Amino acid sequence: MIIKEQIMIKKYILLMLLVLFAGNLNAQAKTYKMVFVPASEKGDESDYTSLIAITEKLTGLNIDTIKVTDYNAAVEAMRAGRAHLAWYGGKTYVKAAEIANAEAFAAGVRPGEKDAGYYTYFVVKKNSKLKKFNDVKGKVLSLNTIGSTSGDLIPQVELNKINLSIKNKEHFKKVYYAGSHDACLL
């Protein structure tokens, strides 16, 4: 059951920003490296196949992918010059802009929506007694990964609005980082 407090962040640091390393993308280079953190349990570039195909078509660039295991590694690949492009969430983009000279040039917009943004859901088991957002105090909480905008930062912001913090041991019985959005549901 999805608790009804569905959160939409519009025009905030945009959903999964596609960023361009502020280097020279000139005609001499044949292939550009795109770094990504797997978006699903499958964990391969098929998560980004459509994005890569569209980017290649619109820009004329050839793109190879570099898979990394976490957001910090994606930023570091850009900072070190091993990647030219990345698909980041808002929190990671801010870090990449600061230390890797990343520059946003596009944002993902879901089909049927006018603005870039994303949703964060708090999910409980079907027969759970948790019916309101405030009911989560003292329970076990599973988040995505440290550094995830939709799976870590925004849930913490929303919890703080009701005076709960994952850092306060009295607020949650246990807080887990599951490693992916899918794994949070297990």
Question: In which residue ranges do the predicted regions lie?
Answer:
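Sec-dependent N-terminal signal peptides
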Residues: 12-21
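N-terminal, post-signal-peptide region of Sec/Tat-exported proteins
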Residues: 50-91
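Bilobed "Venus flytrap"/periplasmic-binding protein-like clamshell domains
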Residues: 30, 34-56, 68, 91, ...
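Ligand-binding "clamshell"
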Residues: 96-109
